[in-house]
Amino acid sequence: MSRRVLLILPCCAVASACGPNIEAETIANRVVMLTNAENEPLTIHKIVVNDRPGRSECVDTPAAQLGPGRTYTKTFFYCDDVQAVDVETDRGTVTIDPN
């Protein structure tokens, strides 16, 4: 039994680390552009900039569905310069360094 668990756990860890394929760009360190780089639509549930979920100006909850190649744009004007973007989707969570 423990042998099966050891074989399954690495697969789960690898699968959860993959997350959705999203491309990110920043403009003037305030505007974040997220593009769905997958072949299937995905839904963006939450975006957190600079690992600051407690600051409302650094969080967006758009519930936006993006088809393949489609882009979602959000301005984080009152947040500090964008250094990292955490994106939570219906397919998992991914952290992106847009710089």
Name the predicted role of every residue range:
Residues 32-39:
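Asparagine-centered strand-capping/turn motif at beta-strand->loop junctions
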Residues 19-25:
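Bacterial lipoprotein signal-peptidase II cleavage site
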Residues 76-99:
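Terminal connector regions
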Residues 42-54:
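Short acidic, flexible loop segments centered on an aromatic residue
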Residues 54-82:
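Intrinsically disordered, low-complexity Pro/Gly/Ser/Thr-rich segments with frequent PxxP/GP/PP motifs
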Residues 1-7:
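Bacterial N-terminal signal peptides that target proteins for export
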